[in-house]
Amino acid sequence: MTKYFFSSSFLLFLGNWIGQIGLNWFVLTTYHNAVYLGIVNFCRLVPILLLSVWAGAIADKYDKGRLLRITISSSFLVTAILCVLTYSFTAIPISVIIIYATLRGILSAVETPLRQAILPDLSDKISTTQAVSFHSFIINICRSIGPAIAGVILAVYHAPTTFLAQAICYFIAVLLCLPLHFKVTKIPEDASRYMPLKVIIDYFKLHMEGRQIFITSLLIMATGFSYTTLLPVLTNKVFPGKSEIFGIAMTMCAIGGIIATLVLPKVLKYIGMVNMYYLSSFLFGIALLGVVFHNIVIMFICITLIGLFSQWARTTNRVYFQNNVKDYERGKVLSIIMMDRGMIPLGSLLMSICADVFGIVRTFSIMGISTICITMVFYFINRKLKLKLEESNHGIS
């Protein structure tokens, strides 16, 4: 079952990247309006924030394999319709693109927590850490090759062909999902009465350590993870006129992420999960500071480390919550945890304003320092709470 799930995931994520690049290019070249591009991407992302909790509740109630087939089949259907429309008509209304982006956003909002909830149940032969790490590895591989494939398609053919490639990826992904079946987790009667939001509030009341990790993640997603938006500005400032530097930098970042997912399961045998999360977040902040040096070798090394440590932080975050949640609450809790990604666009906006006011080099320094400070503050808060809990338990015993 593992091979079918990960093969399907690879094709789904590959299709997502090819389609995303193709859609952005289609909107820009067809309508020549940057506002339309912003609206389309807003419609694609906002359902994730609005529907994730509801989607997580669904993942806890029904056969996850069937839900996965439904979501990917629906993605194939709407993408195939868009493909037919763009091939059939020389111009289509922007409203059609907005409707498509919204539908894909809704399906993504359901599929993301669902996929995370499946990982611990894949196989007895691999641990949750290995499953999450390999899942992240696939995401990073697709992030590396997806845009490149889309670029080749756009150069040789045109944007509608990227939608065709996307639909083909989805279709094969659906076929690979056919053997996937998972037992529905039995929800206790007293737990089934509670609304999803109450379950999440009660979870964070009980798990103080998890609460600190989640808050840390929300903040550093805004301060540090917006680097992808600002990196082209930095490379153009430090190395003006050398556009290839940005492409190489993004490749190095992806390589760092791939290395991180491969070695993390081994590293976690020697370093505790929580300590690993805070350590990788701290080193991520240090790496952000390193990219401001006007030295191409140092920049590429630091970019690689950014990819490595940021992926370590994200993966240990996901693994921690996978290992510290009840089976029948996994979908609900993970749906909230995955919403930390919603802080990246907000952080990008804030850091873009900082770049206009203070300059791009100082902005990266601000990003690095703020990420380091946030990590250290919440690490010591978490440590203090842990010591208090140990003292109280010792007093009781």
UniProtKB/Swiss-Prot annotation:
GO cellular component: plasma membrane
Membrane-crossing residue ranges in chain numbering: 10-30, 39-59, 67-87, 93-110, 137-157, 162-182, 213-233, 245-265, 271-292, 296-313, 333-353, 358-378
Disruption phenotype: Deletion of the gene impacts growth in iron-depleted media. Mutant accumulates staphyloferrin A in the cytoplasm. Does not affect staphyloferrin B levels.
Annotated localization: Cell membrane
PROSITE patterns linked to this entry: MFS
Major location (coarse): membrane
Mode of membrane association: Multi-pass membrane protein
InterPro entries: MFS_dom (IPR020846), MFS_trans_sf (IPR036259), TM_effector (IPR010290)
GO terms (BP aspect): response to antibiotic
A GO term, aspect molecular function: efflux transmembrane transporter activity
Protein's recorded name: Staphyloferrin A transporter
Gene, per the UniProt record: sfaA
